[in-house]
Amino acid sequence: ACDLLKWLQIMEAYEKGGYAYHATMPTDAMARCRDAMRETENFGFDNARAAQQALGDRVRALLTATGFLSVAAEGFQAPGVVVSYTDDADIQSGRKFLVEGLQIAAGVPLQCDEPSDFRSFRIGLFGLDKLHNVDRTVQLLEQALSRIC
């Protein structure tokens, strides 16, 4: 966790001509996070929310139409990540997506006594580039799926 009070104390020590060391501040990460928050604010939080929901809905519908059923039950489906069943080890591992230039995440065990041959895969729908280009994002996935399946 980032203890901002501690960093305030570090800064104040320097301002008073002193010295203090706690750890290396993750300034690059904080600056990038700030920039992403500003970009989201400029896009509009309501627009971002609507685009994320539309993207999640469309990707889930595309996967379902392609034969990949959602692991999450209706009403419990997150708009930012889609987890689907597969029986193909190369889809589960992401290998077939990688050949198409897409990165996905392998599925993880549900830890609820699923059978040993249980397989799933996850598609993360993160990033403002995807929210700014929902149609393009879905189209690229659709094209890749047409070659994978």
Language model regions located:
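Active-site C-terminal subdomain of aminotransferase-like
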Residues: 1-61, 129
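Alpha-helical structural signal in soluble globular domains
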Residues: 58, 62-66, 144
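Flexible, glycine/charged-enriched surface loops at secondary-structure junctions
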Residues: 44-51, 68-74, 149
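Short amphipathic C-terminal alpha-helix that caps PH/PH-like domains
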Residues: 137-145
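Conserved C-terminal alpha-helix-loop-beta "cap" of PLP-dependent enzymes
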Residues: 64, 68-136
